[in-house]
Regions:
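Signature of uroporphyrinogen-III synthase
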Residues: 1-248
Protein backbone atom coordinates (compact mmCIF):
# COMPACT_ATOMS: atom_id res chain seq x y z
CA UNK A 1 0.00 0.00 0.00
CA UNK A 2 1.15 3.52 -0.84
CA UNK A 3 0.28 6.51 1.35
CA UNK A 4 -0.09 9.68 -0.76
CA UNK A 5 0.40 12.91 1.20
CA UNK A 6 -0.44 15.41 -1.55
CA UNK A 7 -3.40 17.81 -1.50
CA UNK A 8 -6.50 15.88 -2.56
CA UNK A 9 -6.90 17.97 -5.72
CA UNK A 10 -3.40 16.94 -6.86
CA UNK A 11 -3.44 13.27 -5.88
CA UNK A 12 -5.72 11.86 -8.58
CA UNK A 13 -3.14 11.14 -11.29
CA UNK A 14 -0.58 9.53 -9.00
CA UNK A 15 -3.28 7.44 -7.31
CA UNK A 16 -4.53 6.20 -10.67
CA UNK A 17 -1.04 5.31 -11.93
CA UNK A 18 -0.23 3.39 -8.75
CA UNK A 19 -3.56 1.55 -8.77
CA UNK A 20 -2.83 0.55 -12.38
CA UNK A 21 0.21 -1.33 -11.03
CA UNK A 22 -2.18 -3.34 -8.88
CA UNK A 23 -1.04 -1.57 -5.70
CA UNK A 24 -3.45 -0.15 -3.13
CA UNK A 25 -3.31 3.52 -2.15
CA UNK A 26 -4.45 5.55 0.85
CA UNK A 27 -4.97 9.32 0.72
CA UNK A 28 -3.45 11.41 3.49
CA UNK A 29 -3.53 15.11 2.51
CA UNK A 30 -1.25 17.18 4.71
CA UNK A 31 -2.30 20.57 3.33
CA UNK A 32 -4.51 22.11 0.67
CA UNK A 33 -3.66 24.87 -1.82
CA UNK A 34 -5.62 28.13 -1.89
CA UNK A 35 -5.24 30.99 -4.34
CA UNK A 36 -4.42 34.37 -2.81
CA UNK A 37 -4.72 37.87 -4.22
CA UNK A 38 -1.31 38.87 -5.50
CA UNK A 39 0.03 42.40 -5.76
CA UNK A 40 1.28 42.91 -9.31
CA UNK A 41 4.87 44.21 -9.28
CA UNK A 42 5.38 47.51 -11.09
CA UNK A 43 8.99 47.14 -12.19
CA UNK A 44 10.37 45.14 -15.11
CA UNK A 45 12.46 42.06 -14.37
CA UNK A 46 15.52 40.52 -16.00
CA UNK A 47 14.94 37.05 -14.56
CA UNK A 48 11.88 35.14 -13.32
CA UNK A 49 12.16 31.92 -11.32
CA UNK A 50 9.09 29.72 -10.86
CA UNK A 51 9.34 27.59 -7.74
CA UNK A 52 6.61 25.02 -8.42
CA UNK A 53 3.92 23.85 -10.82
CA UNK A 54 1.42 25.53 -8.49
CA UNK A 55 3.29 28.80 -8.93
CA UNK A 56 2.82 28.49 -12.70
CA UNK A 57 -0.88 27.68 -12.45
CA UNK A 58 -1.76 30.43 -10.00
CA UNK A 59 0.41 33.07 -11.69
CA UNK A 60 -0.90 32.42 -15.20
CA UNK A 61 -3.43 35.25 -15.08
CA UNK A 62 -0.53 37.65 -14.42
CA UNK A 63 1.78 36.46 -17.21
CA UNK A 64 1.17 39.55 -19.35
CA UNK A 65 2.20 41.72 -16.41
CA UNK A 66 5.32 39.89 -15.26
CA UNK A 67 6.69 38.23 -18.41
CA UNK A 68 7.92 41.19 -20.45
CA UNK A 69 10.68 40.58 -23.01
CA UNK A 70 13.62 40.57 -22.93
CA UNK A 71 13.57 38.22 -19.94
CA UNK A 72 15.15 34.94 -18.83
CA UNK A 73 12.88 32.31 -17.28
CA UNK A 74 14.04 29.51 -14.99
CA UNK A 75 12.30 26.90 -12.87
CA UNK A 76 13.24 24.86 -9.84
CA UNK A 77 12.92 21.59 -11.77
CA UNK A 78 11.59 19.69 -14.81
CA UNK A 79 7.96 19.39 -13.70
CA UNK A 80 7.60 23.15 -13.33
CA UNK A 81 9.40 23.70 -16.64
CA UNK A 82 7.03 21.29 -18.39
CA UNK A 83 4.05 23.18 -16.98
CA UNK A 84 5.34 26.47 -18.44
CA UNK A 85 6.17 24.92 -21.80
CA UNK A 86 2.62 23.55 -21.99
CA UNK A 87 1.47 27.17 -21.68
CA UNK A 88 3.77 28.24 -24.55
CA UNK A 89 6.27 29.95 -22.26
CA UNK A 90 9.94 29.49 -23.21
CA UNK A 91 12.09 28.21 -20.36
CA UNK A 92 15.79 29.11 -20.42
CA UNK A 93 16.97 26.56 -17.90
CA UNK A 94 16.25 24.29 -14.93
CA UNK A 95 17.90 21.47 -12.95
CA UNK A 96 17.35 18.29 -14.95
CA UNK A 97 17.58 15.64 -12.25
CA UNK A 98 17.25 17.07 -8.76
CA UNK A 99 14.72 19.84 -8.16
CA UNK A 100 16.34 22.15 -5.65
CA UNK A 101 17.40 25.74 -5.16
CA UNK A 102 20.98 24.65 -4.54
CA UNK A 103 21.24 22.84 -7.88
CA UNK A 104 19.64 25.79 -9.67
CA UNK A 105 22.14 28.22 -8.14
CA UNK A 106 25.03 26.00 -9.25
CA UNK A 107 24.07 26.50 -12.90
CA UNK A 108 26.65 28.67 -14.75
CA UNK A 109 24.06 31.37 -15.47
CA UNK A 110 23.48 32.09 -11.78
CA UNK A 111 27.11 31.84 -10.74
CA UNK A 112 27.88 34.91 -12.87
CA UNK A 113 24.60 36.79 -12.33
CA UNK A 114 24.82 40.26 -10.80
CA UNK A 115 23.04 43.63 -10.87
CA UNK A 116 19.83 42.00 -12.12
CA UNK A 117 16.18 42.42 -11.19
CA UNK A 118 14.88 38.97 -10.20
CA UNK A 119 11.31 37.86 -9.49
CA UNK A 120 10.66 34.61 -7.61
CA UNK A 121 7.14 33.27 -8.18
CA UNK A 122 6.06 31.00 -5.35
CA UNK A 123 3.55 30.21 -2.61
CA UNK A 124 3.35 32.23 0.58
CA UNK A 125 6.12 31.34 3.01
CA UNK A 126 8.74 28.67 2.49
CA UNK A 127 12.52 28.62 2.28
CA UNK A 128 14.43 31.90 2.01
CA UNK A 129 17.61 30.24 0.74
CA UNK A 130 17.18 31.14 -2.93
CA UNK A 131 16.38 34.79 -2.30
CA UNK A 132 19.06 35.23 0.35
CA UNK A 133 21.72 33.83 -1.97
CA UNK A 134 20.72 35.78 -5.07
CA UNK A 135 20.24 39.13 -3.36
CA UNK A 136 23.91 39.31 -2.38
CA UNK A 137 24.58 40.57 -5.93
CA UNK A 138 21.07 41.28 -7.24
CA UNK A 139 17.74 42.85 -6.38
CA UNK A 140 15.21 40.09 -5.61
CA UNK A 141 11.44 40.27 -5.10
CA UNK A 142 8.76 37.68 -4.36
CA UNK A 143 5.49 37.25 -6.23
CA UNK A 144 3.37 35.04 -3.95
CA UNK A 145 0.26 33.68 -5.65
CA UNK A 146 -1.01 30.88 -3.40
CA UNK A 147 -0.86 29.62 0.16
CA UNK A 148 -0.68 26.20 1.76
CA UNK A 149 -3.32 25.58 4.42
CA UNK A 150 -2.45 22.72 6.82
CA UNK A 151 -5.13 20.06 7.13
CA UNK A 152 -6.88 19.28 10.39
CA UNK A 153 -7.04 15.63 11.44
CA UNK A 154 -10.17 14.17 9.83
CA UNK A 155 -11.90 10.81 9.54
CA UNK A 156 -10.10 10.30 6.22
CA UNK A 157 -6.71 10.64 7.94
CA UNK A 158 -7.70 8.24 10.73
CA UNK A 159 -8.98 5.66 8.26
CA UNK A 160 -5.91 5.96 6.06
CA UNK A 161 -3.56 5.53 9.04
CA UNK A 162 -5.31 2.33 10.14
CA UNK A 163 -5.45 0.89 6.61
CA UNK A 164 -1.82 1.75 5.96
CA UNK A 165 -0.58 0.13 9.17
CA UNK A 166 -2.43 -3.12 8.45
CA UNK A 167 0.37 -4.03 6.02
CA UNK A 168 4.04 -4.32 6.89
CA UNK A 169 5.40 -3.21 3.51
CA UNK A 170 3.62 0.11 3.04
CA UNK A 171 5.45 3.02 1.40
CA UNK A 172 4.89 6.74 2.05
CA UNK A 173 5.34 9.29 -0.75
CA UNK A 174 6.51 12.69 0.51
CA UNK A 175 6.59 15.69 -1.84
CA UNK A 176 8.06 18.41 0.36
CA UNK A 177 9.56 19.26 3.73
CA UNK A 178 6.22 20.75 4.69
CA UNK A 179 4.38 17.53 3.82
CA UNK A 180 6.82 15.56 5.96
CA UNK A 181 6.42 17.86 8.95
CA UNK A 182 2.63 18.04 8.71
CA UNK A 183 2.28 14.27 8.25
CA UNK A 184 4.21 13.68 11.46
CA UNK A 185 2.05 16.21 13.26
CA UNK A 186 -1.21 14.62 12.06
CA UNK A 187 -0.16 11.03 12.81
CA UNK A 188 1.09 12.04 16.25
CA UNK A 189 -2.31 13.59 16.99
CA UNK A 190 -3.89 10.23 16.23
CA UNK A 191 -1.39 8.20 18.28
CA UNK A 192 2.28 8.37 19.29
CA UNK A 193 2.39 4.58 18.80
CA UNK A 194 1.18 5.00 15.22
CA UNK A 195 3.90 7.59 14.59
CA UNK A 196 6.57 5.18 15.81
CA UNK A 197 5.19 2.56 13.40
CA UNK A 198 5.19 5.08 10.53
CA UNK A 199 8.91 5.66 11.05
CA UNK A 200 9.62 1.98 10.37
CA UNK A 201 8.03 2.21 6.91
CA UNK A 202 9.84 3.08 3.70
CA UNK A 203 9.39 6.61 2.40
CA UNK A 204 9.98 7.96 -1.10
CA UNK A 205 11.03 11.61 -1.18
CA UNK A 206 11.62 14.07 -4.00
CA UNK A 207 14.95 15.59 -2.98
CA UNK A 208 18.10 14.97 -0.96
CA UNK A 209 17.08 17.85 1.30
CA UNK A 210 13.89 16.03 2.33
CA UNK A 211 15.88 12.82 2.78
CA UNK A 212 18.25 14.47 5.27
CA UNK A 213 15.35 15.90 7.27
CA UNK A 214 13.58 12.53 7.29
CA UNK A 215 16.74 10.94 8.71
CA UNK A 216 16.84 13.51 11.48
CA UNK A 217 13.19 12.77 12.29
CA UNK A 218 13.87 9.06 12.68
CA UNK A 219 13.02 7.45 9.35
CA UNK A 220 15.44 4.69 8.32
CA UNK A 221 14.25 3.48 4.90
CA UNK A 222 14.44 6.49 2.58
CA UNK A 223 14.58 6.52 -1.21
CA UNK A 224 15.04 9.62 -3.40
CA UNK A 225 13.43 9.60 -6.86
CA UNK A 226 15.57 10.49 -9.88
CA UNK A 227 12.90 12.97 -10.98
CA UNK A 228 9.87 14.30 -9.10
CA UNK A 229 7.30 13.30 -11.73
CA UNK A 230 4.37 10.97 -11.10
CA UNK A 231 5.76 8.53 -13.64
CA UNK A 232 9.16 8.39 -11.95
CA UNK A 233 7.52 7.61 -8.61
CA UNK A 234 5.47 4.88 -10.28
CA UNK A 235 8.52 3.47 -12.09
CA UNK A 236 10.31 3.28 -8.76
CA UNK A 237 7.39 1.49 -7.13
CA UNK A 238 7.23 -0.94 -10.02
CA UNK A 239 10.95 -1.73 -9.97
CA UNK A 240 12.44 -4.97 -8.70
CA UNK A 241 13.29 -3.50 -5.34
CA UNK A 242 9.64 -2.76 -4.66
CA UNK A 243 7.95 -5.93 -5.87
CA UNK A 244 7.41 -6.86 -2.24
CA UNK A 245 4.69 -4.18 -1.91
CA UNK A 246 1.29 -5.66 -1.12
CA UNK A 247 -0.86 -5.55 -4.24
CA UNK A 248 -4.61 -5.33 -4.74
Amino acid sequence: MILITRPLAQATNLKSLINNLGIKTALFPTFEINKIKAEIPKQKFDVIIFISANAVDYAEQYFNNIIVEPISIFTIGPITAKKLIEKDIKVDGYPKNNSSSKVLLNMPYFKDLKDSEILIVRGKGGSEYLKNTLQVKNNVNYFEVYERVPCDLTRLHSQSIKEFLKVDDGVIVINSLESLSLMIELVNKESKIFLDQFKTREIIVLSDRIKEQAKILGFKKITVTLNPSDQDVVDLLGSKNNKKITRI
